[in-house]
Amino acid sequence: MAHKINLNPLGFAIIRVYIRPKNSPTMAYAYFKVDTGANCTTISNKRLSELGYDKNWIMSGKRLEGNERPTVASGLVVDDCYRVILPEIQIGDWVGYNWSVLTSLSVPFKFLMGTDSMQFFNWNLDYEKNVCIFDLIPGKRKLLFDQKEQSIHSIEDTEQK
């Protein structure tokens, strides 16, 4: 089932992802910018700080350099972009899927945010109608939970390694 959200006037969609901040009993949400595809998504250092993550912990993640750093719709490169692993994540109701159910596990898990987090979806941005349509890729529904890394990967990606 495809989901549709409106693009803003600058040409990218803002989607909301729910996460549980470190040492917090409640869920919070973070915004992602989606441009012409999954490669243009990031969560900013500032937003992570607002959600209560320690600055040193954020900077312990992999800092994206050069071509690895995402760009926004204007073509400008995003500064201070870190690839970090968050304690828990749940995709919000804009998608309608629950990662715990998809992995057939009820335990909390970590999920790599950034470009990898959007690889499970097909993206279609219609700039004339100002909408972004996206849906979960059918073959990606079978996800593998890596207990050692505490992360999830699509089975197809794991089998290639």
Question: Each predicted region: which residue ranges?
Answer:
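Pepsin/retropepsin-fold aspartyl endopeptidases
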Residues: M1-K161
